Curated annotation (Swiss-Prot):
<feature type="modified residue" description="Phosphoserine">
    <location>
        <position position="232"/>
    </location>
</feature>
<dbReference type="InterPro" id="IPR004012">
    <property type="entry name" value="Run_dom"/>
</dbReference>
<dbReference type="InterPro" id="IPR047340">
    <property type="entry name" value="RUNDC3A_B"/>
</dbReference>
<feature type="modified residue" description="Phosphoserine">
    <location>
        <position position="419"/>
    </location>
</feature>
<feature type="region of interest" description="Disordered">
    <location>
        <begin position="372"/>
        <end position="403"/>
    </location>
</feature>
<feature type="modified residue" description="Phosphoserine">
    <location>
        <position position="416"/>
    </location>
</feature>
<comment type="similarity">
    <text>Belongs to the RUNDC3 family.</text>
</comment>
<dbReference type="InterPro" id="IPR047338">
    <property type="entry name" value="RUN_RUNDC3A"/>
</dbReference>
<feature type="region of interest" description="Interaction with RAP2A">
    <location>
        <begin position="1"/>
        <end position="298"/>
    </location>
</feature>
<keyword id="KW-0175">Coiled coil</keyword>
<feature type="region of interest" description="Disordered">
    <location>
        <begin position="216"/>
        <end position="239"/>
    </location>
</feature>
<dbReference type="InterPro" id="IPR037213">
    <property type="entry name" value="Run_dom_sf"/>
</dbReference>
<feature type="compositionally biased region" description="Polar residues">
    <location>
        <begin position="372"/>
        <end position="384"/>
    </location>
</feature>
<protein>
    <recommendedName>
        <fullName>RUN domain-containing protein 3A</fullName>
    </recommendedName>
</protein>
<dbReference type="GO" id="GO:0010753">
    <property type="term" value="P:positive regulation of cGMP-mediated signaling"/>
</dbReference>
<comment type="function">
    <text>May act as an effector of RAP2A in neuronal cells.</text>
</comment>
<feature type="domain" description="RUN">
    <location>
        <begin position="52"/>
        <end position="189"/>
    </location>
</feature>
Length: 446
């Protein structure tokens, strides 16, 4: 069954993979060759005068360039937003040029996009070809587009001219077009964006006759030459260039070639001068930025040294202030502790017989730490003397407003009846505080 399928395929002449690959190679070679011929024709005929749309050679060149840019262009768009398509629903090489040439400085892409009389992608592509030729930047546009390999592979299938080394040859050929002045009027003119272009190959086809075959006229000429007594040439069918017209034609062709080469030489010299001026400007800008960088580095070092000196000075001041601050804090802490202990009431003021004793029991954990109260070490001596007078003369509890409001919570908690009832239940963690009028009672475990 497989053999019959292969025979059927061969009989129908279906293209195989090898034949398809050959077709792609032949297409690339044909397009590049005919493009070279077209560029040479333009350079020979229109070096001294501008070219417009009425020139048949330009129309053919534009068709060739459009075919090259459309060679193996992907028909279906990759995944993306719907607005990515052109307005006519068809994709053309303009979609590729619009993205790949957007990085060209001062490009004409936005101008073509804003043209009101051009709507289809094919018409915009043809308008771009004309504008790029008038700007003499066609080679620059194609070179920039080829550098964007990711975008190029996104729009073209394998085997396309834009993905092969022929694209580099194309950019080299397009450089010579900078010697020609193109003049097109796109304002108000509606470019045809529906009809496909057709390349005219007839101006570039030339039949070369073999030496083995002679026409009747050449045979007759050979016979006449053989009967004459004059010396005949080695190949009688090749005419000798002996008349003045032939020499004049040769001279005219050489003059045209010289003009073309001279125009290209002038363009390249101008381009070199432009690049040299740009290089000088960049070198001057580089030197200026280098000086700014050095100045910024020196200023940074100066500021760093100044900040280091400030840090060292602050450290010295801090070191000198630390020893003088500890002594007042420690002394104030001791005075505050003494005043707090002396202000606690005796048990006789509670008027309970079971609590009558010359000593009071307090839990060790009920003492408030002096560290949180160190901020109050600056209490006035009047408040301390007032606390000592109240210890011997009256029961605990302020008659008026206590000048030490931070002690009210502690006084209330110790003077309450439930706290006095719980004194008998204190155990191993209790301590005795003497009710004697001495300055600071000694603490001793029970």
């Amino acid at each position: 069954m497989e053999a019959s399928f292969v025979q059927t395929t061969m009989a129908l002449g279906l293209p195989s993979k090898k034949a398809s690959s050959r077709n792609v190679i032949v297409e690339r070679r044909n397009l590049i060759t005919v493009c070279r011929f077209s560029v040479k024709t333009l350079l020979e005929k229109y070096t001294a005068e501008p070219i417009d749309d009425s020139s048949e050679e330009f129309v053919n060149f534009a068709a060739i360039l459009e075919q090259i840019l459309s060679h193996r262009f992907k028909a279906c768009a990759p995944a993306g937003p719907a607005s990515w398509f052109s307005s006519d629903g068809q994709r053309g090489f303009w979609d590729y040029i619009r993205l790949a040439c957007s990085k060209v400085p001062n490009n004409c892409v936005s101008s073509i996009e804003n043209m009101e009389n051009i709507s289809t992608a094919r018409a915009k592509g043809r308008a771009w070809i004309r504008v790029a030729l008038m700007e003499k930047r066609m080679s620059e546009y194609i070179t920039t587009a080829l550098r964007d390999n990711r975008t190029t592979r996104r729009f073209y299938d394998s085997g396309a001219i834009m993905l092969r080394e022929e694209a580099t040859v194309l950019t080299g050929m397009l450089i010579g077009l900078s010697a020609i002045d193109f003049s097109f009027c796109l304002k108000g003119e509606v470019l045809d964006g529906k009809t496909p272009v057709v390349i005219d190959y007839t101006p570039y086809l030339k039949f070369t006759q073999s030496y083995d075959y002679l026409t009747d006229e050449e045979e007759r000429h050979s016979a006449e030459s053989s009967t004459s007594e004059d010396n005949s040439p080695e190949h009688p069918y090749l005419p000798l260039v002996t008349d003045e017209d032939s020499w004049y034609n040769k001279w005219h062709k050489m003059e045209q070639k010289f003009r073309i080469v001279y125009a290209q030489k002038g363009y390249l010299e101008e381009l070199v001068r432009l690049r040299e001026s740009q290089l000088k400007d960049l070198e001057a800008e580089n030197r200026r930025l280098q000086l700014q960088l050095e100045e910024a580095a020196a200023q940074n070092q100066r500021e760093k040294r100044e900040l280091e000196g400030v840090i060292l000075e602050l450290q010295e001041q801090l070191t000198g202030l630390i020893p003088g601050d500890h002594a007042p804090l420690a002394q104030g802490s001791k005075e505050l502790t003494t005043s707090l202990v002396n202000q606690w009431p005796s048990l006789s003021t509670l008027h309970r017989p079971e609590g009558a004793s010359n000593s009071k029991l307090y839990r060790r954990h009920s003492f408030m730490s002096t560290e949180p109260l160190s901020a109050e070490a600056s209490l006035s001596s009047d408040s301390q003397r007032l606390g000592e007078a109240k210890r011997d003369e009256e029961p605990w509890g302020p008659i008026g407003k206590d000048p030490t409001p931070s002690m009210l919570g502690l006084c209330g908690s110790l003077a309450s009846i439930p706290s006095c009832k719980s004194l008998a239940s204190f155990k191993s963690n209790e301590c005795l505080v003497s009710d004697s009028p001495e300055g600071s009672p000694a603490l001793s475990p029970s």
